[in-house]
Amino acid sequence: TKKATGSNLTQSYVKEFLTAYFTKKDLGENRNRYLPFMTEAAYQQEVNTEKEPATQAYKGYVVDTKLKSATIYIDQENKTAIVQVNYTQTQLQKKNNYANAQTNVLSKTTLRIRYIKQEGKYLVSQLEPILIVDTLTASQEASLPNLNQPKTTEGETNKWQN
């Protein structure tokens, strides 16, 4: 297969980045693979996030992360991609010990990836998790008749209901 160069913002180019970003043996192990896809500032932000104590706490416990699939939406005009990603991980009970490990634990995330073009190549300038709400579900929930009624504690009679 032909390697995407990044001169165009395409699904295959975004997927190449996602593969580099989500495939790793352990925290930080994949930096050299995703660095070529990012601006220096975005890369530094990612490294800083990996160094945070809350993130470091999982090092050695959440391992073997692999990209499984990605749905990629590209907005060429704003140089942005919205990606819905499925990936698996192995979760260890003891650091670096695969005994009793939970393997292939499926996780999902949605990211907005902003790109800028530098020297003829699209680079990730910002990576942020986002939440996409299913408006059909939200509007169905909103149409429920008791949505805005006062909540009651157990054993209390709700005076609004007959």
Where are each of the predicted segments found?
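N-terminal, intrinsically disordered, polar/charged segments of Gram-positive cell-envelope systems
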Residues: 1-18, 139-159
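Generic detector of bulky aromatic hydrophobic side chains
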Residues: 1, 31, 35-36, 62-63, ...
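Short amphipathic beta-strand and strand-loop transition segments with alternating hydrophobic
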Residues: 68-76
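Short, solvent-exposed beta-strand/turn "edge" segments of beta-rich domains on protein surfaces
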Residues: 4-8, 76-77, 102
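Core segments of small alpha/beta cavity-forming domains
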Residues: 2-64, 68
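Intrinsically disordered, low-complexity segments of exported/surface proteins
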Residues: 75-79, 122, 156-161
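Exposed beta-sheet edge and beta->alpha loop/turn motif
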Residues: 79-149
